[in-house]
Every structure is written in structure tokens, then in C-alpha cells.
Amino acid sequence: MTDLTRLTIAEARAKLSAKEITAVELTDAYIGAIEAANETINAYVTVTPEKARAMAKASDARIAAGKAGALEGIPLGIKDLFGTEGVHTQACSHILDGFRPRYESTVTQNLWNDGAVMLGKLNMDEFAMGSSNETSYYGPVKNPWRAKGSNMDLVPGGSSGGSAAAVAAYLCAGATATDTGGSIRQPAAFTGTVGIKPTYGRCSRWGVVAFASSLDQAGPIARDVRDAAILLKSMASVDLKDTTSVDLPVPDYEASIGQSIKGMKIGIPKEYRVDGMPEEIEALWQQGIAWLKEAGAEIVDITLPHTKYALPAYYIVAPAEASSNLARYDGVRYGLRVDGKDIVDMYEKTRAAGFGREVKRRIMIGTYVLSAGYYDAYYLRAQKVRSLIKRDFELAFQAGVDAILTPATPSSAFGIADEDLASDPVKMYLNDIFTVTVNMAGLPGIAVPGGLDHKGLPLGLQLIGKPFDEETLFKTAHVIEQAAGRFAPSKWW
């Protein structure tokens, strides 16, 4: 039998439905792959083999009874940000040591309702703060990709680095992830996988550990566009427990795969041609434009004049919200507690020991920009810029543009513990330069592999869509995928 872990979700679904394989066989194949590779890749922080086998057994029973759900028997990895009832949920932070929620996040509950199987919890940047998966309390994740002729370990991107690496290394059929400033799309681009950040409000945030509440959005990382569409259909829903979730019908995203894009208008924003952008990224962008033109799309130049202010505005708004959200972690009711001489001393010692360096940095930035003397100068101004960024997109879409094409990242994956980036946080933050505008405007964005660079590492293209028009992104991304082909790393782990 061929390696079952190589099956896409769509292929596995067909084989399960035809009873050519069982959910238990498929799950066991992934558990075996995790046992063999996780010590090297470090994608999983918690593995749940007993739970997975029990869920798979129940899936087989439902398939036999003709009651299969949309994801029946499909083994998935869950980012450690999603609350999973009775299963360690730590946001990869020391401060949440030992926390086992008594609740299930809405997104994961939706997946289990559709028959999916949980393999375990995936590594990530601590509290989703990072672009390289190096801020995790559990240590960095290794990208399954390596440069040609090199043994250097590369980052998988962040914050959903565990999700992207697990999908690329065949350690799950698909994964949940979250995106606050690019945390789905950037790791997808770095690992040759597909990741979609849906419109803000498309997926419930209930039960997901908060980073920046007005920016966070859950979405899937998958091996191809069709699989991403299948997963998002199950993840998305309105939720009365999350007032920011939107009560709109969830389309059959998979039905949009293969549809023609003839006559569609694709916008190309000149502001995304940033200083110092590598020639390979520009060439990839031009190749993407050519593919869409060949498929019958009309290419139009557009302007998004406030793009250059997006990154500084994001790094004011996101830390401000994070400093408020993370104030709740004090060691009183759950997680880490470091004893002190009194309650204030206990708070201080717990937070000092529990939060990592990058999280502390962002809490301090957030507290500073919200302080009385700086609120107007920084936070209020950043929110005004955010409104202008959103307006730029609205004007482009009002002018008839159906989707916008940009690069997903300014480079391919870089090395773990890169000294240049470690010494300068701003250089690390620049990894988000093409992605943060989408979060600031609350729009959907998808990253799809476009090719390999001169080192043999994957590069991604990004498509940005109108609010709640993920269908257009899926059908357009599928055109790129068909033209570019699919990419998989050579196994070294």
C-alpha cells in the first residue's frame, strides 16, 4: 500500500468513503510518522494517540453506518492556541504550564462535529507573537525544506510554524492555524503549503487564546487549495459566543475550485514594490501575473497609498491589544505560579518567569502606546491609519477589482537563530510587510506556492479578496496552483 500520509484530504476522503482504507489505518499512519519525525521537526508539543485512535474508531463506525461527516476520519493537527477540552493548551508559553481547558474552541468543535480526528497540538510562537516559530517555550520548529546542498536548519515561519511544518512533512493531513499579521500566510509561503486567512468574523474566535482581538482570525493550512477549501468550510460558522463572528451562510468553497477566472479583474498594487525587494520575488510576482493573464483575467494597476504605514501602525495596534489581553495571566487560577512574599510580588514573579522575551517586549510596547501621555500620539493615530488602509482597499474593489495579487513574503525561509534578525527585532517584523495590511483591513488573504528560488526553497504568492469572498480567492489560487505545480521537500528528517 502507498504511504497513506501522502494522500491529500480530498484523496483520503474518497478512499475512506469507498472503504478502501479505514480511519484507524490512516490515523495510525500519521501517528507512526509523528513518532519517527517529531523529535527532529518539533512540530507537535502534545501528541494524543489514544484520543486519535478512539476518534478514528468512531469515524469508521459512522462510515459503516452511512453517517459520515464532511471530514470523517481525516487526521488533523491543532495549533496550541485553540482550546481543546482536557488536552494541554499552552499557547506555547511557560505561563500556561499545565492548563487543560474544560471547554472546546468553536472551530475545533466544528471540526470534530464533521468527523475529523485530532492527532495533537502544534508548536507555535509564544502567544502567536513571532514570524519564525523561535519564541516558543518548546523551542523552534525546523522547516522540512532545506536549501540545495545545505544542512542548515531553516525556520518554517510563524506564528503557525508547527502547523505549516507538520503539513509539509506529512505529519497531519491538514492543520488549524491563526493569523494576526500574517501567521498563516507567511509560514505557508515558507513551507510550500497553502494557507488562507479568512475575512475577520468568518471563523469564531471563541476558545482561541487571544493575541490582538480585532486582528486575530482562524484559518487552515493544507497541502493544496482544494484541501484548504474543504477545511475552511468546516471551520467557519457564526457563533453566538463570539459577537465578532458574522451571521452569513458558509459557501461550499470546494465548488469554486476549477471555475474559470476569465474576465476577472486582478489588481497589482505598485506600493508592494518595496525597496530592497529581491529580484526573485519580483520575477515570481510577474510570473503570477502572466499565469492569471493566460487564464483570461484582466490585469490592472492599482494604488494602495497607505500601505507604507501598515507595518508601523500594526506594531502599535497589535501590542496595545496584546498588553490588555495578557494582563489576565497572573498565576492565580491556572498555569504557572511563582510564590512571592505577597500577592503583588507573586504576580510580578509569575509574569517575569512565565512570559518570554518577545512577549514581554510587545506587552511593554502596548502598555507604552496606551499610556496617558502617548495614547493620542501613537494608538489613536495608528487607528486612523488603519481606517485609511481599509479605505484604500474599498476604493480598489469599488473600481471593479475582484482580487489583488502580491508576493506573500519578501524572501524565502531564513536560518534558525539568524544573528542579523535576532539582534534587530524590526528586521524580523519586516517579514510581515506584505501580509499585515490584510489584517488591518479585515480582508481575506490566501498564500499559494508559486515556485522555488535559486536555493530550491519555496516562494509564495498572495491573493487578497473582498470581504467574505473567499470563493474568488480559492478559484484564483487554484489557477496559480495548476500553473505552478505542487512542491514537496526532499525527506532528510
From Swiss-Prot:
E.C. number: 6.3.5.7
Keyword match Protein biosynthesis: yes
InterPro entries cross-referenced by the UniProt entry: Amidase, Amidase_CS, Amidase_dom, AS_sf, GatA
Catalytic residue positions: K79, S159, S183
Single annotated GO MF: glutaminyl-tRNA synthase (glutamine-hydrolyzing) activity
Gene Ontology cellular component terms for the protein in this record: glutamyl-tRNA(Gln) amidotransferase complex
Catalyzed chemical reaction(s): L-glutamyl-tRNA(Gln) + L-glutamine + ATP + H2O = L-glutaminyl-tRNA(Gln) + L-glutamate + ADP + phosphate + H(+)
GO biological process: translation
Gene3D superfamilies in UniProt: Amidase signature (AS) domain
Cited Pfam families: Amidase
Keyword terms of this UniProt record: ATP-binding, Ligase, Nucleotide-binding, Protein biosynthesis
Keyword Ligase attached: yes
SUBUNIT field: Heterotrimer of A, B and C subunits.
Family indicated by similarity: Belongs to the amidase family. GatA subfamily.
Protein's job: Allows the formation of correctly charged Gln-tRNA(Gln) through the transamidation of misacylated Glu-tRNA(Gln) in organisms which lack glutaminyl-tRNA synthetase. The reaction takes place in the presence of glutamine and ATP through an activated gamma-phospho-Glu-tRNA(Gln).
Name listed for the protein in its UniProt record: Glutamyl-tRNA(Gln) amidotransferase subunit A
Organism encoding this protein: Sinorhizobium fredii (strain NBRC 101917 / NGR234)
Phylogenetic classification of the source organism: Bacteria, Pseudomonadati, Pseudomonadota, Alphaproteobacteria, Hyphomicrobiales
Primary gene name: gatA
